[in-house]
Amino acid sequence: MNRTVAIVVFPGVQALDVSGPMDVFAEANRFLAPEDHYRLDVIGVERGSMACSNGLTLSAHRHFSEASQVYDLLLVAGGPQLPFLDFGSTFDAWLREACGRARRFGSICNGAFMLARAGLLDGRTVTTHWNDAEALAQLCSSSRVEADRLYVEDGQLYTSAGVTAGIDLSLYLLARDYGAEVALSVAKRLVVFTQRSGGQSQFSPFLTPHAEPTSAVAMVQLYVLANLTGDLTIADLANAANMSARNFSRVFAREGAAPVSKKLLS
């Protein structure tokens, strides 16, 4: 049986919040029988074309007032200005009713603010983009906002962290629908990890500076990241730092305050 996935968009929406999840479910159709295909629906807060935050233009399939069906999954996207936007009581009422009808509903990135303003996060455990977590907790004080989670499942409610975490959430939901093998096939098509778990930190260790950018430690860390599949030796690493192996080990221990093997894993 076909499954319907809808995503709500608005002027200023983050394009990747929309295209990431939609690509997961669209690519899944390559591996599914026609009768199991996902049907995708883009619902607009406004009619006509809407500019994304990056300048791309989206055209919704229908205005929210025309979206009265029961969706298997209803998602709301986020955007840089969404925490400051209010779409009015008519939209909020529609969103409450639509989410109440849906088998599952949720948000991508700070789309959680849209759900919060409609009263859909009261008493729930959720996540959002790390940069907006404090503001969401203030807006919806009865919610438990877990700022350092990629995605959170609370009953029928699914919320994801910032931007690309929407892909992780979508892969998780795809695996729930059709199994891990299909989700893995889609992840391979999209060249992404499958599957970063919901409890994994939003903060990548590779985005955290561990050493001065011109130091031997930093040079070697960059070299390792560029050669993750290689069988690297101390000699290789020393060469990347333009040092002898002996001197490299001494310098690396001094700057990294740990043996080479331990420091590279940090």
Language model: regions and residue ranges:
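N-terminal functional module of multi-domain proteins
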Residues: 1-117
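Internal, well-ordered alpha-helical segments in soluble enzyme and binding-protein domains
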Residues: 21, 91, 111, 132-135, ...
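A short alpha-helix-loop-beta-strand transition element characteristic
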Residues: 33-40, 144, 178-185
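A conserved active-site-flanking secondary-structure segment within enzyme catalytic domains
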Residues: 122-150, 185-186, 190
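Conserved anion/nucleotide-ligand pocket segment
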Residues: 149-189
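Accessory alpha-helical/coil subdomains and C-terminal extensions
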Residues: 177-222, 230
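Basic/polar phosphate-binding segments, predominantly the helix-turn-helix DNA-binding elements
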Residues: 206, 219, 223-226, 230-266
